[in-house]
Amino acid sequence: MTLITRVLNSNLPLRLSALKTVRQLQCGYSSHAKYAEHKPIERIRNIGISAHIDSGKTTLTERILFYTGRIAEMHEVRGKDNVGATMDSMELERQRGITIQSAATYTLWKDTNINIIDTPGHVDFTVEVERALRVLDGAVLVLCAVGGVQSQTLTVNRQMKRYNVPCLAFINKLDRLGSNPYRVLSQMRSKLNHNAAFIQLPIGVESNCKGIVDLVQERAIYFEGEHGMDLRLDEIPQDMRVESQERRQELIEHLSNADETLGELFLEEKPFTEADIKAALRRTCIKRTFTPVLVGTALKNKGVQPLLDAIIDYLPNPGEVENLAYIEQEGKEKQQVVLNPARDGKDPFMGLAFKLEAGRFGQLTYLRCYQGVLRKGDNIFNARTNKKVRIARLVRLHSNQMEDVNEVYAGDIFALFGVDCASGDTFTTNPKNHMAMESIFVPEPVVSMAIKPNNTKDRDNFSKAIARFTKEDPTFHFYFDNDVKETLVSGMGELHLEIYAQRMEREYGCPVTLGKPKVAFRETLVGPCEFDYLHKKQSGGSGQYARIIGLMEPLPPNQNTLLEFVDETVGTNVPKQFVPGVEKGFREMSERGMLSGHKLSGVRFRLQDGGHHIVDSSELAFMLAAHGAIKEVFQNGSWQILEPIMLVEVTAPEEFQGAVMGHLSKRHGIITGTEGTEGWFTVYAEVPLNDMFGYASELRSSTQGKGEFTMEYSRYSPCLPEVQEQVVRQYQESQGLGQPEKKKKKN
């Protein structure tokens, strides 16, 4: 058979002379003028690149920026030149070789504007992924060909499901020893419950990785020339034709199950065209009923250009995704409104602030425009505070570079300066429509540490750093504990808090000392407890009078991190204007329990009846009555302590399996699954966070430094009786008290 071979030269070699000029520029970035041109909505993609840590997200983004001409030179995450990847702009990111903050950029591929957000892979920075996915229309889920589906992959998958984000899967690192993309596909189906199939196959793995087979167009693609810029199309290798036919048939079967149009052709045994398959891939990907799986190795410059084609071909444009706002007016039911994604500016501007950052010119607020158009000089209103803001400057972002634009349209991601707001706020040009968008899910912190500046003279800088970081990151909390006279910071893990401590020293010249990590326990009721409390105080003049009757009860286990207040009063025994005072009192008292001093959670407060005085009743009196009622429930109710449970994943050589599982069991871990492949094993377990401190050094010593683990927050669960006794005892000792005479959970 005569082989028909042709070379596809991308536009990159044609730019070589231009790139030389670009390299001479101080910033090293190509001109952004052509990238900032406004495109029709069909020519826009907003995507995120998400994965488990060390799966190659940032390296992949670096290749995308290079192949699309956005940057002139590629740099590695841990390169010898110490420059670091473009999207890792923070010095700490370059030094550690990890992504800490999500970074935004935009580029062009085949006349389509692609807005990209590269997100962190470490579980401690999961809120960065959360708020990125909230504003994106599609995502690339990167999986390691060796590690497969790992703990943070599961988290990212849940986040994509929460915001209904369609995704492509890219199995990266085909060049690594032990890579097995077929095993990864199997894990996607079993662990992530994805209806997934290959649309590409690797031509060789590990050191034999030569190129890929495109199953849709039935051809082989080889990446040649400097940096793999030249694509050579060829016939599928002889030894892969049978496998390619089988995998293509498997792809069609999976697609037919998810797509009605293709399913009819399949049942009628009619021939499929390439256009039929591509159209079905796009429909099912947008509906999240099918996940196309692509393969490659970003580090070795293979598979990136076909991935860019797939982003354009299969992921939705902003007009194909339904985005909702809500009309909220007092005394009326909340109404749902579908926003208009057309880029014509006919409807009022609607945008969502999804990230805050302190820049050189003040606070930088990242927004996504969902409706209308916003121009320099316009006035916008914060839907939460109703404050007016005049737009003096509009920028689009390329990592840490800001590029000025005059206007943004629906579907664009941009930033503003000097806007006082919180993450998740809605902005609009028409405040009279009372519309707001759904905010961003923020997980509760699970670890606390004492923190103090090393030098007293640094207190001002310390305060500035804390104020900035708590505003930027909703999972980073700060408070002063009056009982132990300590300043505490809380976050998603030890690394999370260590990074902020290092940033305080680097960015504010304020070295700090962190104490030992403390677990964020919670207190909850075991069963319902009634209350009937009268607050009455008379000391001359108008007094205080408030009576409240009701019930406090536990919420279901899947809601045990929440607090719920329910007003069930009928009539005027408790006037409606005083009910907010009762709720305020309940929430204030929930900040510190009496068993261990930790917050209450998983509790519902039901206000059922009460009494008031025509003169002496006030909101303050009812707030104090709530304080008294909860103290009553503290004394009469049965309470228990909840602790955070972590999903732990350990990988090590199989000869250490017994030792690893033994150590997890000693730490009160419950083994939920094991896997083994080519001399290595992976064990999955649920372990209390309180028992995980110091595990890293134990794992290193027991596996000769070859084992590694990851963990992520799963849920809160009742702690063991001996742990509860220990926590209560430590709290009582810190308060200078004996054991409390309080009912605890009966075991």
Swiss-Prot record:
GTP binds at residues 51-58, 118-122, 172-175. Keywords: Elongation factor, GTP-binding, Mitochondrion, Nucleotide-binding, Protein biosynthesis, Transit peptide. InterPro entries: EFG_II, EFG_III, EFG_III/V, EFG_IV, EFG_V, EFG_V-like, EFTu-like_2, G_TR_CS. Pathway: Protein biosynthesis; polypeptide chain elongation. Signal peptide: none annotated. It holds the Pfam family EFG_III. It is found in: Mitochondrion. Mitochondrial GTPase that catalyzes the GTP-dependent ribosomal translocation step during translation elongation. During this step, the ribosome changes from the pre-translocational (PRE) to the post-translocational (POST) state as the newly formed A-site-bound peptidyl-tRNA and P-site-bound deacylated tRNA move to the P and E sites, respectively. Catalyzes the coordinated movement of the two tRNA molecules, the mRNA and conformational changes in the ribosome. This is Elongation factor G, mitochondrial.
